[in-house]
Amino acid sequence: MNKIIKGDRVVVIAGKDKGKQGQVVRVLGDKVVVEGVNVVKRHQKPNPMRGIEGGIITKEMPLDISNIAILNPETNKADRVGIKLIENEGKVKRVRFFKSNGSIIGA
């Protein structure tokens, strides 16, 4: 189980976009794409066969997962994530929790 998944609110803790907040759009192994963060301009070549217009486009590039931290909604601060096992009706389930206060993420 990954500590950061799609849909999490995160804050950038290192790099040129330090302090910016956003939502995780995609997780790519040890990198994540965050909405509105690490935006770059790229030149797009037109391709009429695929219906792609040419020009300069802006897109979000992946950030290393070590440069972001999940945002705790209770404290509105960056927090660390832990994983613990919870037994429910004989089944063991892995859940993520905030290390600062122990509250379960997404519950």
Swiss-Prot record:
Keywords: Ribonucleoprotein, Ribosomal protein, RNA-binding, rRNA-binding. PROSITE patterns: RIBOSOMAL_L24. GO terms for cellular component: ribonucleoprotein complex; ribosome. InterPro entries: KOW, Rib_uL2_dom2, Ribosomal_uL24, Ribosomal_uL24_CS, Ribosomal_uL24_KOW, Translation_prot_SH3-like_sf. Pfam families: KOW, ribosomal_L24. GO terms for biological process: translation. Transmembrane segments: none annotated. GO terms for molecular function: rRNA binding; structural constituent of ribosome. PANTHER family: MITOCHONDRIAL RIBOSOMAL PROTEIN L24. Part of the 50S ribosomal subunit. One of two assembly initiator proteins, it binds directly to the 5'-end of the 23S rRNA, where it nucleates assembly of the 50S subunit. One of the proteins that surrounds the polypeptide exit tunnel on the outside of the subunit. Belongs to the universal ribosomal protein uL24 family. NCBIfam families: rplX_bact. HAMAP family: Ribosomal_uL24_B (MF_01326_B). This is Large ribosomal subunit protein uL24. It comes from Neisseria meningitidis serogroup C / serotype 2a (strain ATCC 700532 / DSM 15464 / FAM18).
